[in-house]
Amino acid sequence: MFTSPGPVLFQFGPLTLRWYGLLIAMAVLIGLNLSSRLAQSRKLENGLISDLLPLLVLFSVIGARLYYVAFEWHNYANQPIKALAIWEGGIAIHGALIAGTLTLILFCRWRSQPFLDVLDVLAPSVALGQAIGRWGNFFNSEAFGVPTDLAWKLFIPYANRPVIYADAEFFHPTFLYESIWNLLLFVLLLVLFRWGSRERQNFPAGTLSCVYLIGYSLGRIWIEGLRIDPLCVGALPPACEGGVRIAQLMSAMLMVLGGLGLWWLKRRQQQLPVSTNR
């Protein structure tokens, strides 16, 4: 059984350190170190990742928040200023992926860097960062699943339970499911990166990113079906009956995009003369 100690790590006067913030900082630092090492193995520009990461994190967080607020506008319409209170929770990974990708495209054009190579270098760190960041949901007692009595159940305080589940105490720890899934995906991506670095002729740039899209989306579609707080169109959470879960729809689209990307990369690679293969 899991029980959250609360969202605040410590508080000293006006200074408050939250677990979520600490986890995000950890994910960024680990991602910086890992991506920098992978960038060296791909012979990318020195200092590229350290220059890119602050911009990528900033705009990804902004995109994640805007995406969430857009689909939850009914909760912010009367108090738009609350949309800025990101420390209260409410970000969406798909918004971060969209904003982060746009930022990366512009950055690579500015620095004349190979977009697909940089994207592949970042993919393992993104998966690992998600595995770490999901534990923020645990400390905030949010993004949990339907009630359950399994041995690994998660206790949710009364104040954090939806009204229709007010009498339930234990729920699926969907944060844990997604954290484990992303950790396994990270290991897979790292293995593929090492293998692809030796077999560039059979592993064109962009392959790793497509594998990430497919792998993450498969897990998210399953896990999202368990959650009781989905972003929803056509119905209201927690049931979302008769509506569409936005994360499942986006994940399905990204999975198709990843599959088409692999097909296109393979086809393009086959059309290249052998002497120009990388």
Swiss-Prot record:
Role: Catalyzes the transfer of the diacylglyceryl group from phosphatidylglycerol to the sulfhydryl group of the N-terminal cysteine of a prolipoprotein, the first step in the formation of mature lipoproteins.
Tagged with keyword Oxidoreductase: no
Keyword Amino-acid biosynthesis tagged: no
Residues that, per the record, bind a 1,2-diacyl-sn-glycero-3-phospho-(1'-sn-glycerol): 134
Enzyme Commission number(s) of this protein: 2.5.1.145
Pfam families: LGT
Species, as recorded: Parasynechococcus marenigrum (strain WH8102)
Name of the protein described by the UniProt record: Phosphatidylglycerol--prolipoprotein diacylglyceryl transferase
One record GO biological process: lipoprotein biosynthetic process
Enzyme class, broadest EC rank: transferase
Bilayer disposition of the protein: Multi-pass membrane protein
UniProt family annotation: Belongs to the Lgt family.
InterPro entries with a match to the protein in the record: Lgt (IPR001640)
GO molecular function, one term: phosphatidylglycerol-prolipoprotein diacylglyceryl transferase activity
Segments crossing the lipid bilayer: 12-32, 44-64, 86-106, 113-133, 173-193, 203-223, 246-266
Pathway where this protein functions: Protein modification; lipoprotein biosynthesis (diacylglyceryl transfer)
PANTHER family in the cross-refs: PHOSPHATIDYLGLYCEROL--PROLIPOPROTEIN DIACYLGLYCERYL TRANSFERASE, PROLIPOPROTEIN DIACYLGLYCERYL TRANSFERASE
Compartments, as annotated in UniProt: Cell inner membrane
PROSITE patterns (alphabetical): LGT
Annotated GO CC locations: plasma membrane
Coiled coil: none
Key words, A-Z: Cell inner membrane, Cell membrane, Membrane, Transferase, Transmembrane, Transmembrane helix
